[in-house]
């Protein structure tokens, strides 16, 4: 079949590669005029995210990620409150994206193609229209167009992301810029600090060019802080040019007075090692935390994938994993079924269940950490994983 994938992020790339390898004629369309980049933002590398690279592309997992062997909690006085053995792998969005993109044929990944609409959803073909005037007609269209999905908004106009009540401040610092004491305390672990109505986590990730050797890595932080709507959130999301953003503020866009407040708060409330990381971050950025639950992913000859479908909070480190898992499930369903609509319905049933349980689990984690203050170090329900903690 001829298949168009709308959206060229990690989920769209994984879908395009798997469907191509299964024998389909696939093109991936990305709205950005240039290859994507997220300034090395860290991700927990769950098996679903790396599966294509390790199973199909022969990539060594050690070349794209950093292994840690402990979960560590700090007290405000910088001492270790709790520590347990647990193996994780961490990478960066850019590292995984670049590896997946290198597996694509250049003509199969098409930039500067932002979708504006499509037609003939229930007929024998689907024609997608792009902002540059081009069109593409396919047997199937996979919408992997992210949090602000035009496809979802069109197909399910009542399904809007719900603000969770807090945002994630993010940033990273090269390990050589940190003191030896801080590097030692943060080494070989994901490190947490939990305090009233907030928590922060720190972990090592590859360098900006994918370096994984000690001395060449970054330390990445994700700091969840509550902001109320009706003024506080809107002020935070107003960038240095006075434009109010809705979903995120990229590096370099956060207003200086908000960065100053964040650094002051860090020095007053966080352990010294984590505060050092915060203060030395050159360009912190912000991602708003949302939930979104939908009950349909297949629509005629089209389907939703990844964040264009169900959207969970980041507390399970499973955003990219869910998108990749959707891609594997879609490919498997098409392979098992001769009838397209049956295949898409099978995909929908499978991945709705995955998405719904993830949303329920991450909503509970967020509620416990940001509002109920019932987070307990060592609780196994807090372990990362897509389909269950630790999986």
Give, region by region, the residue ranges found by the protein language model:
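A short coil-to-beta-strand element that immediately follows conserved catalytic motifs
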Residues: 187-189, 259, 269-285
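FAD-binding beta-loop-beta segment adjacent to the flavin cofactor pocket
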Residues: 285-313
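Active-site-adjacent segment of FAD-dependent monooxygenases/related oxidoreductases
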Residues: 32-104, 369
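Conserved FAD-binding catalytic core of PHBH/FMO-like flavoproteins
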Residues: 59, 63, 79-80, 87, ...
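N-terminal Rossmann-like FAD-binding beta1-loop-alpha1 element of flavoenzymes
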Residues: 2-28
């Amino acid at each position: 079949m001829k298949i168009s994938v709308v959206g060229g992020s990690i989920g769209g790339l994984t879908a395009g590669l798997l469907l191509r390898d299964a024998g389909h004629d696939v093109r991936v369309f990305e709205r950005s005029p240039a290859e994507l980049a997220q300034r090395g933002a860290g991700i927990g590398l769950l098996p679903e995210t790396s599966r294509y690279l390790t199973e199909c592309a022969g990539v060594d997992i050690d070349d794209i990620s950093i292994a840690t062997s402990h979960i560590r909690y700090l007290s405000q006085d910088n001492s270790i409150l709790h520590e347990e053995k647990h193996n994780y792998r961490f990478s960066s969005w850019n590292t995984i994206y670049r590896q997946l993109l290198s597996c694509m044929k250049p003509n199969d990944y098409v930039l500067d193609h932002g979708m504006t609409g499509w037609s003939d959803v229930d007929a024998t073909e689907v024609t997608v229209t792009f902002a540059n005037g081009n069109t593409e007609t396919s047997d199937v269209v996979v919408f992997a167009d992210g949090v602000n999905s035009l496809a979802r908004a069109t197909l399910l106009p009542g399904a809007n992301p719900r603000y969770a009540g807090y945002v994630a401040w993010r940033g990273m610092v090269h390990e050589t810029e940190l003191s030896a004491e801080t590097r030692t305390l943060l080494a070989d672990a994901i490190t947490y600090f939990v305090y009233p109505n907030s928590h922060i986590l720190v972990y090592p990730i590859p360098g900006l060019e994918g370096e994984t050797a000690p001395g060449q890595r970054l330390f990445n932080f994700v700091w969840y802080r509550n902001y109320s709507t009706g003024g506080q959130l809107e002020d935070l999301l107003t960038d240095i040019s006075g434009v109010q953003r809705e979903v995120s503020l990229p590096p370099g866009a956060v207003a200086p007075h908000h960065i100053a407040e964040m650094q002051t708060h860090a020095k007053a409330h966080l352990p010294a090692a984590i505060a050092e990381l915060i203060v030395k971050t050159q360009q912190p950025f912000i991602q708003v935390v949302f939930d979104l639950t939908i009950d349909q992913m297949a629509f005629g000859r089209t389907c939703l994938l990844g964040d264009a479908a169900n959207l969970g909070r980041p507390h399970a480190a499973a955003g990219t994993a869910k998108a990749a898992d959707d891609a594997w499930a879609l490919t498997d369903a098409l392979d098992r079924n001769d009838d397209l609509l049956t295949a898409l319905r099978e995909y929908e049933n499978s991945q709705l269940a995955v998405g719904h349980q993830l949303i329920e689990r991450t909503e509970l984690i967020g509620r416990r950490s940001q509002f109920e203050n019932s987070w307990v170090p060592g609780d196994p329900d807090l372990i990362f994983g897509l389909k269950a903690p630790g999986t």
